[in-house]
C-alpha cells in the first residue's frame, strides 16, 4: 500500500540529510508503529507520506514513494488528502472553525460532497467515535482528548484508506488513552491502515503488526516482540505500573507559596496548598480537571475569583502551546532573550545537557516537538525564577530526552519549587517527590512520595482509567 524505495531527503537551506536511503513497505490493514528519538526523522517520513513534503516543506528528495503502486508525486494533493488521513500531535492546528459540528463537515464541504452523502458520513462518524455529547460544541471549550476525537473524525469523513496519528497520546489522561486504544482497535478491525508515530507504546503494544525504528535518518524494521527485547534502543516503559521511584525526599519546611482557599469560577473550588522550596509536585487529574487553570493562576495569567495566593515568588510557566512562547530567530537568541547577563558557559552547558547544542542557530519554529519542549525547559532553567511550572513537559519526548529533562528539573528543585502537570507516570516516578490530585474541581489527594504512598498513585491512575 505505502512503500518507500531508497528515499533520502534534505531540507532547503540545510546540508544535513534528514533521511538517508530509507526503504520500507506498509501493507493494507496493518497497524504500524513509527518510533525513534526526537529529531530522528519521524516527522519527515510522516510529511512525505501525507504530501506535506513537497507541498509545504521544500528540499531535495531522491528515491521513490509509492501509494498503491502509483508514484505519490504523480497523485494530486487533494486525492492524497482524501485517501491518507492525518492527525497531528496538536489537533488544534487542523481546525478552521470554532464549532465541532461545523468542523466535522468542513472537509466534505470543500470536496463538494452532496448534502445527503455528507449527512450519511457525518452520522456514521459520530456513531463510530461516540461523539454525541460533543457535537455542536465550541472547540475551544472541550478537552484535549475530545479535540483529538474531532480531528480523527474530520479525517474519517473523507473515508480514507490510511490514517496517520502523530503522538496521539501526548496530552491524554489514562482514561482518554484507554478510549484511544479502543478507537484504534475499532479502526483496525474495520480494515483501515494505521500508522502511529509515538514514543509511549504501552497502550498500543497489543495492536501493533510491525515496528519501524527511525535512527539518524535510517529505518530498521522489527516486530513488537523484538522491540520489547531490544537493548540498542532505549524505550519508554511497556509496563507503567512496574516502575521504581527515583526522587524520594523528605519534606522541606521552607515555605515559598501559600494558596489559601482559592476558587476560579466553577472550574476550581476552594484550593489550599502550601508549596515549599525543594518540592517537585506532580499535578495529576483527568483532562479538564483544572490543572492548566491552576498553573495559569499561579503565573498571574488568570486571577482567582475567590481566595488569596500569598508569597514572594517569581514564576515561569512552560505551556502546552509551545509556539506562543518563542520570540526570536534562533535557539541561542531565544535563550538569551531576557537573560542577557547569563554566562556563555552556563548556556552552552545547558544546551549540551539537553541535546540542543547543534541546533543553537536554528529557528525555534523549525524544531521538532520534543526539541521545542527542551528549548523552553532550558529557558526556564536559566531564568531568574523560583517557581517553575510545566504543563505536560514530556509530550513529544523519547526516553533518552525524558531522562535528560528529568535530571535538569531535579537539579533545579534544590533551590526552587516545581509544579509539573502531567499524565506521564514514568516521568512522574523519575522526577517528582510530591503528588497533588485534582478531581471534581478540588484537591482530592496531597502527599509526599515514598514506597508506601506509591500504591496510592497506582490507585489514582487506575481510577482515572474508569
List each language-model region with its residue ranges.
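Conserved ABC ATPase signature
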Residues: 138-142, 146, 363-367, 371
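Catalytic Walker B motif of ABC-type/P-loop ATPase nucleotide-binding domains
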Residues: 163-166, 388-391
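ABC-family nucleotide-binding domains
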Residues: 173, 398
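Hydrophobic anchor residue at the start of the ABC signature
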Residues: 152, 377
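Conserved ABC transporter NBD signature motif
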Residues: 58-70, 307-315
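H-loop/switch region of ABC-family ATPase nucleotide-binding domains
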Residues: 198-199, 422-423
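Conserved ABC ATPase "signature" region
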Residues: 116-134, 344-359
Amino acid at each position: 500500500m505505502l512503500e518507500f524505495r531508497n528515499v533520502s531527503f534534505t531540507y532547503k537551506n540545510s546540508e544535513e540529510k534528514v533521511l538517508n536511503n530509507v526503504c520500507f513497505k506498509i501493507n493494507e490493514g496493518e497497524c504500524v508503529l513509527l518510533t525513534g528519538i526526537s529529531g530522528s526523522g519521524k516527522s519527515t517520513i510522516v510529511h512525505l507520506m501525507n504530501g506535506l513534503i513537497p507541498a509545504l516543506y521544500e528540499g531535495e528528495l531522491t528515491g521513490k514513494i509509492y501509494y498503491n503502486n502509483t508514484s505519490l508525486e504523480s497523485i494530486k494533493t487533494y486525492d492524497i488528502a482524501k485517501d491518507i488521513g492525518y492527525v497531528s500531535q496538536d489537533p488544534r492546528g487542523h481546525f478552521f472553525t470554532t464549532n465541532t459540528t461545523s468542523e466535522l463537515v468542513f472537509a466534505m464541504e470543500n470536496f463538494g460532497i452532496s448534502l445527503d452523502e455528507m449527512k450519511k458520513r457525518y452520522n456514521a462518524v459520530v456513531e463510530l467515535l461516540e461523539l454525541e455529547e460533543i457535537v455542536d460544541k465550541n472547540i475551544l471549550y472541550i478537552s484535549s482528548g475530545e479535540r483529538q476525537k474531532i480531528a480523527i473524525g474530520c479525517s474519517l469523513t473523507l473515508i480514507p484508506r490510511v490514517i496517520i496519528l502523530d503522538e496521539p497520546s501526548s496530552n491524554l489522561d489514562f482514561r482518554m488513552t484507554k478510549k484511544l486504544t479502543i478507537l484504534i482497535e475499532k479502526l483496525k478491525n474495520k480494515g483501515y491502515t494505521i500508522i502511529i508515530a509515538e514514543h509511549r507504546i504501552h497502550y498500543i503494544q497489543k495492536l501493533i503488526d510491525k515496528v519501524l525504528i527511525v535512527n539518524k535518518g535510517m529505518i530498521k524494521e522489527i516486530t513488537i516482540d523484538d522491540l520489547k527485547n531490544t537493548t540498542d534502543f532505549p524505550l519508554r516503559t511497556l509496563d507503567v505500573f512496574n516502575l521504581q521511584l527515583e526522587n524520594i525526599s523528605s519534606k522541606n519546611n521552607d515555605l515559598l507559596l501559600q494558596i489559601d482557599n482559592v476558587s476560579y469560577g466553577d472550574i476550581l473550588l476552594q484550593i489550599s496548598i502550601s508549596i515549599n522550596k525543594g518540592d517537585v509536585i506532580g499535578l495529576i487529574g483527568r483532562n479538564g480537571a483544572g490543572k492548566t487553570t491552576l498553573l495559569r493562576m499561579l503565573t498571574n495569567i488568570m486571577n482567582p475569583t475567590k481566595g488569596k495566593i500569598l508569597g514572594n515568588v517569581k514564576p515561569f510557566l512552560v505551556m502546552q502551546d509551545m509556539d506562543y512562547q518563542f520570540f526570536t530567530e534562533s535557539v541561542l537568541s531565544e535563550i538569551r532573550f531576557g537573560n542577557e547577563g547569563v554566562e556563555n558557559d552556563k548556556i552552552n552547558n545547558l544546551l549540551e545537557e539537553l541535546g540542543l547544542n547543534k541546533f543553537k542557530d536554528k529557528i525555534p519554529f523549525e524544531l521538532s516537538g520534543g526539541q521545542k519542549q527542551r528549548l523552553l525547559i532550558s529557558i526556564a532553567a536559566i531564568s531568574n525564577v523560583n517557581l517553575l511550572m510545566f504543563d505536560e513537559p514530556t509530550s513529544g519526548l523519547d526516553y533518552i530526552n525524558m531522562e535528560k529533562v528529568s535530571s535538569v528539573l531535579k537539579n533545579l528543585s534544590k533551590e526552587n519549587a516545581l509544579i509539573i502537570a502531567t499524565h506521564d507516570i514514568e516521568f512522574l516516578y523519575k522526577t517528582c517527590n510530591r503528588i497533588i490530585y485534582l478531581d471534581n474541581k478540588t484537591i482530592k489527594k496531597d502527599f509526599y512520595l515514598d514506597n508506601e504512598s506509591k500504591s496510592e498513585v497506582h490507585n489514582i491512575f487506575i481510577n482515572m482509567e474508569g
